[in-house]
Amino acid sequence: MIELKGLTKVFRQNGQEIVALSDVNLHVPRGQIFGILGQSGAGKSTLIRCVNLLERPTAGEVWVDGREITRLSPGELRAARREMGMIFQQFNLFDSRTVFGNVAYPLEVAGWPRARIRERVEELLALVGLADKAGAYPNQLSGGQKQRVGIARALAPGPKLLLSDEATSALDPDTTRSVLALLREINRRLGLTILLITHQMEVVKQVCDSVAILEEGKVVEQGGVLELIGRPGSRLRELFYESTEEAAHRIHPDGVRVLLFFVGASADRPLISETVRRFRVDANILQGAVERIAGATVGRLLVEFTGLPEDIQDALRFLEEQGASPEVIPNG
């Protein structure tokens, strides 16, 4: 659906060049929720604005739905943008318009007949759970409700692609979860491709199928969420499990710290007790959790193994064969 090839964006300010994006290559499959994860200043917002050409790249190609959009004429670009919806951190609603009027606005601009506009807006308000708020004004809504209006407005023209620019970062955790659940429902029901930028790990865990990590304007890693967190040494896995570091310091001097990762049915298997019985090692569980990530049940354990070195190595080979993806964490 989206293909970025050698995307580079350089800003010139006070006689200096600031490289916001450097040789970014990215593939977003059709029908996925694809996350761009990075801290402030990583280039996330610049990247998403290059996708719809609100920012024109300095170099590289931007392919959306089979078209290289940097080569389109102004008229062709306007038509292409109608197939891309966008939602924002600060909602960007018209205070003087009702909820109905905000959602109807892009359809009015596009010249839709009034009867068709009413039908479409009512359909979308039902989809986002605001059918009873059609006559309300933005100042009468909560933050989560405002974002739902923004989502409905972005969906109004029937886009193939939805761009989300930190759409949940201004919301509290409970509201964030409900908005992300709505995006997942829209993705499944409409088959809509969603490109979502965020600095929040929980957003990636809850809703993304795939992710790219952006650091200092460069993609340092990309792939399926489950694939990356199951890969020892991956950057995403490291970021997901930074919380294990405090527990990792509570270790026996002769112990070996191992991070284990389980997906699906394997998360319910008693692999640790089986490993202890078979390989004459002791296991001290320092930390553990079971979560829903990318639609799958995911378990992780930080375990301290003690015993003879050869027995521990045999145990680790066994765990790898069982799909537990063991990663030894160095001491110190």
Curated annotation (Swiss-Prot):
List of residues binding ATP: G38, Q39, S40, G41, A42, G43, K44, S45
InterPro entries: AAA+_ATPase, ABC_transporter-like_ATP-bd, ABC_transporter-like_CS, ACT-like_dom_sf, MetN_ABC, MetN_ABC_transporter-like, NIL_domain, P-loop_NTPase
Gene3D superfamilies registered for this protein in UniProt: 3.30.70.260, P-loop containing nucleotide triphosphate hydrolases (3.40.50.300)
SMART domains linked: AAA, NIL
Enzyme Commission identifier(s): 7.4.2.11
GO molecular function: ABC-type D-methionine transporter activity; ATP binding; ATP hydrolysis activity
Main location: membrane
Keywords: Amino-acid transport, ATP-binding, Cell membrane, Membrane, Nucleotide-binding, Translocase, Transport
Subcellular location per the Swiss-Prot or TrEMBL entry: Cell membrane
GO CC term (a single one): plasma membrane
Catalytic reaction equation(s): L-methionine(out) + ATP + H2O = L-methionine(in) + ADP + phosphate + H(+); D-methionine(out) + ATP + H2O = D-methionine(in) + ADP + phosphate + H(+)
Domain ABC transporter: 2-241
Membrane topology, record value: Peripheral membrane protein
PANTHER family associated with the record: AMINO ACID IMPORT ATP-BINDING PROTEIN, METHIONINE IMPORT ATP-BINDING PROTEIN METN
Similarity comment: Belongs to the ABC transporter superfamily. Methionine importer (TC 3.A.1.24) family.
Assembly and interaction partners: The complex is composed of two ATP-binding proteins (MetN), two transmembrane proteins (MetI) and a solute-binding protein (MetQ).
Known function: Part of the ABC transporter complex MetNIQ involved in methionine import. Responsible for energy coupling to the transport system.
Entry protein name: Methionine import ATP-binding protein MetN
Organism: Symbiobacterium thermophilum (strain DSM 24528 / JCM 14929 / IAM 14863 / T)
